[in-house]
């Protein structure tokens, strides 16, 4: 977030955590919050949704920007269902609607996220612009400047801060 601060989030099948300059200590993600983080990660990146969601159902067809798109309903565990629109020709995820359960507020926050500016990166379609909007924080825009493969990271970046 540049001069406004930073957030580090790591999620695996078994654990997850968030650390930021806003909170004095890291926050472990457990139960539904860990599942929710895994779902959000799967929607942001290209993953096999059938490995993440309990059900994925086509519920309709719509036209977006003169293109045919399938409307999907997805569920996992006890989380609220997610509605998504997928381009029928390219398979690009155009947008999704989900209620994000905030661990601090304890209430679901309806959120709509659009994915735009898809580009091919070594055979994988990647959205280089992601726009998320909700009533509490307004609109957040994520833009990818560069997408690289085979980047080496210090493995400690992915450990929970208390486990270093």
State the predicted function of each range.
Residues 12-20, 34, 60-62, 74, ...:
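Short N-terminal helix-initiation segments at or just after the protein's N-terminus
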Residues 35-71, 93-97:
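Short, conserved active-site entrance elements at the starts or edges of catalytic domains
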Residues 1-3, 43-54, 73-77, 104-109:
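Short, solvent-exposed secondary-structure boundary motifs
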Residues 65-161:
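Gly/Pro-enriched, hydrophobic low-complexity segments
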Residues 6-9, 59-63, 119-123:
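Short linear motifs in intrinsically disordered
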Residues 1-39:
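An acidic-aromatic
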Residues 7, 14, 54, 68-70, ...:
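Generic beta-strand structural signal
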Residues 3, 161-164:
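N-terminal cleavable signal peptides for secretion/export
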């Amino acid at each position: 977030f540049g001069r406004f601060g930073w957030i580090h989030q790591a999620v695996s099948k078994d654990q997850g955590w968030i650390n930021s300059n806003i909170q004095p200590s890291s926050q472990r993600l457990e139960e539904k919050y860990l599942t929710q983080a895994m779902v959000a990660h799967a929607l942001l990146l290209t993953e096999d949704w059938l490995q993440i969601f309990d059900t994925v159902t086509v519920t309709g067809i719509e036209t977006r920007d003169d293109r045919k798109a399938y409307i999907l309903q997805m569920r996992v565990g006890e989380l609220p269902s997610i509605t998504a629109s997928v381009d029928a020709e390219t398979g690009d995820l155009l947008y999704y609607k989900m209620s994000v359960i905030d661990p601090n507020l304890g209430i679901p926050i309806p959120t709509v996220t659009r994915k735009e500016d898809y580009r091919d990166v070594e055979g994988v379609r990647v959205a280089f612009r992601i726009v998320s909007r909700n009533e509490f924080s307004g609109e957040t825009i994520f833009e990818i400047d560069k997408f690289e493969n085979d980047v080496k990271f210090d493995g400690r970046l992915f450990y929970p801060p208390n486990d270093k």
